[in-house]
């Protein structure tokens, strides 16, 4: 039996109700709706009186936030000013791989627009390393976790009129259902539409209604169901838990062993209240669309194309605007499909749609009725203030009154390439191989009059080195069978530049068979001298390694890539990235002879 005193002590120590129930093995608590109070952060370290609207929750002492709010409301009433509409804005929480500063950008711009439109913006976030948690960004800031119980405490104190969940990434969007259950109005896309996009079965029904194709997929809860589903739809399959961010715990399974390994890991570490999703893996070009919707019309600032093909997380792929390799029919299809989603889901605000293009056919990968990590990028390079417009739509304005038109916005007169930045030297034992699980920790932007110059700028900004081959300079190749045909041309170009080529047994034999001179080198587990000795010689400029199977850090391919990272040798793990890098190497361009594009003065004359 849990006493009231024990319960209150547990709350003072920071335990949530659900944790207390589990540890005390009780179904009911001594008191319901025992809300926390809020203390003001002392930004002056007790040197003198501080009065900043920056609060943290506590079960010990008075509720300073309630007193602060009462004083402000009394001042407003005394001046005869109308009471402002209170809007709770949920931030993105701690920055981690998969959810970065891009979502904080969206939260901050949302707050600015709300304040500009006469609302009182109350921000909830618990990351001190962001702009959103600067004490003067919102009207008030609550430095508390983004979970239902903590949010309920804030709502009990603030009594807001509405909330915004679509600008804080997956962390904030998970609160939509709870907000709907407690009856707090959500500005923008309704909670049911968000669930319809996230829930596999409901999303499939949506696609049927809209007559939009997607890769066949299934929902599974255990290993037997996963194996049966994979056999039904055919290997390879993309496997991921539902309701995840950054492609977390996502893989491409090529055989039954991969499925067995994955399900063993996922059932141990992931809450199986949400199912695992299996999709037929479609090899093709991946594209991304961010759109602003007002419930009737929509505006697409631009279509982005990923350099790496499907199977590589969009956050780890080089992203190009405007798309370089799409036909007009494919572009028109994406615009049409995006409009269908916007209308059918009753989207108000932002929606992100990811597409795969294979053999001229456009497939939908997923739809996210929220902001995405590409919103700051596409806003900057097109001059379309997406978050500002989305918030105004949530407040009832129409796109047709905002001056940017509807449908697909005209392309900019330049090319912008977003290149991911990785921190593998700080992430020990992490395989550098690209895949559906996001690993990048940042990004840079390269802008130029044409694609190759913009790509070169982006790659240099991301830390790639462009070397002129010297005496004995060489490159190492160890690639999987499916990539070998495409690496023939890449290897030829490097050979033509003066590089000596080395390859592990299978890759070396393939290149020599196709008339590309290549020297065999023993793999990392072979007798010395082997590939490690070659890496340590100081002569290797680039490593091209796409051999990967499973997640075992003991595999030769994984150990090779880690060794390259330790020695600061560029290691390319995707054939598309390799082709782009080699084209830049051969162009002989540098930052000295690429013209500057000043986008600040090119926003359509603005």
Predicted feature locations:
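ATP-binding N-terminal substructure of ATP-dependent carboxylate-amine bond-forming enzymes
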Residues: 42-212, 221-228, 447-605
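Acidic/histidine-enriched active-site and ligand-binding environments that engage anionic O-linkages
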Residues: 228-238
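Non-catalytic accessory regions
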Residues: 1-63
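ATP-dependent carboxylate activation and anion-phosphoryl transfer catalytic cores
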Residues: 1-6, 10-17, 71-85, 104, ...
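Short alpha-helix boundary/capping motifs
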Residues: 20, 234-236, 258, 370, ...
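Residues immediately flanking
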Residues: 92, 241, 367-369
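Conserved A3 ("GATE") glycine/threonine-rich loop of ANL adenylate-forming enzymes
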Residues: 198-201, 244-248
């Amino acid at each position: 039996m849990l006493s009231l005193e024990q319960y209150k002590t547990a709350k003072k120590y920071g335990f949530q109700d659900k944790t207390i129930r589990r540890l005390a093995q009780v179904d009911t608590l001594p008191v319901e709706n025992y809300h926390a109070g809020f203390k003001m952060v002392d930004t002056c370290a007790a040197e003198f009186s501080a009065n900043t609207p920056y609060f943290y929750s506590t079960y010990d002492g008075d509720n300073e936030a309630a007193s602060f709010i009462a004083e402000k409301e009394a001042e407003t009433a005394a001046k005869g000013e109308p009471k402002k509409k209170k809007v709770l804005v949920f931030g993105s929480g701690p920055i981690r791989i998969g959810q970065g500063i891009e979502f904080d950008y969206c939260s901050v711009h949302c707050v600015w627009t709300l304040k500009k439109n006469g609302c009182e913006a109350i921000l909830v976030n618990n990351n001190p390393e962001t702009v959103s948690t600067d004490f003067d960004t919102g009207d008030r800031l609550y430095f508390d976790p983004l979970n239902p119980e903590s949010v309920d405490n804030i709502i009990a104190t603030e009594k807001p009129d509405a909330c915004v969940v679509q600008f804080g990434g997956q962390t904030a969007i998970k609160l939509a259902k709870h907000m709907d259950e407690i009856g707090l109005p959500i500005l923008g896309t309704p909670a049911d539409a968000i669930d319809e996009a996230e829930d596999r079965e409901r999303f499939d029904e949506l696609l049927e209604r809209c007559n939009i194709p997607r890769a066949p997929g299934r929902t599974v809860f255990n290993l037997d169901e996963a194996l049966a589903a994979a056999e039904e739809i055919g290997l390879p399959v993309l496997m991921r838990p539902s309701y995840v961010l950054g492609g977390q715990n996502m893989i491409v399974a090529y055989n039954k062993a991969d499925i067995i390994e994955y399900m063993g890991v996922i059932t141990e570490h992931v809450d199986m209240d949400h199912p695992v999703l299996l999709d037929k893996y479609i090899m093709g070009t991946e594209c991304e669309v961010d759109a602003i919707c007002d419930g009737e019309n929509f505006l697409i600032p631009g279509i982005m194309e990923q350099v790496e093909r499907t199977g590589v997380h969009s956050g780890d792929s080089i992203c190009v605007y405007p798309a370089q390799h799409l036909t007009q029919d494919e572009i028109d299809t994406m615009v049409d499909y995006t409009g269908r989603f916007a209308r059918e889901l009753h989207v108000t605000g932002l929606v992100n749609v990811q597409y795969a293009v294979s053999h001229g056919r456009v497939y939908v990968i997923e739809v996210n009725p929220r902001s995405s990590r590409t919103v700051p990028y596409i806003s900057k390079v097109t001059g379309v203030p997406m978050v500002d417009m989305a918030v105004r739509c949530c407040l009832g304005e129409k796109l047709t009154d905002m001056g940017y038109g509807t449908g697909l916005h005209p392309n900019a007169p330049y090319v912008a390439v977003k290149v991911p930045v990785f921190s593998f030297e700080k992430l020990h034992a992490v395989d550098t191989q690209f895949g559906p699980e996001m690993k990048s920790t940042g990004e840079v932007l390269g802008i130029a009059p044409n694609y190759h110059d913009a790509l070169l700028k982006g790659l240099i900004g991301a830390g790639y080195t462009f070397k002129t081959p010297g005496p004995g300079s060489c490159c190492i190749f160890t690639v999987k069978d499916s990539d070998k045909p495409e690496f023939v041309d890449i290897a030829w170009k490097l050979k033509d530049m003066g590089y000596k080529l080395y390859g592990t047994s299978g890759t070396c034999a393939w290149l020599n068979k196709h008339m590309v001179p290549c020297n065999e080198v023993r793999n990392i587990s072979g007798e010395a001298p082997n590939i490690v000795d070659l890496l340590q010689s100081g002569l290797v400029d680039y490593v091209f390694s796409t051999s990967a199977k499973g997640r075992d850090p003991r595999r030769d391919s994984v150990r090779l890539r880690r060794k390259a990272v330790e020695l600061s040798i560029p290691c390319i793990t995707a054939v598309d990235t390799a082709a782009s890098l080699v084209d830049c190497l051969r162009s002989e361009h540098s930052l000295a002879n690429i013209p500057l594009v000043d986008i600040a003065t090119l926003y359509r004359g603005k």
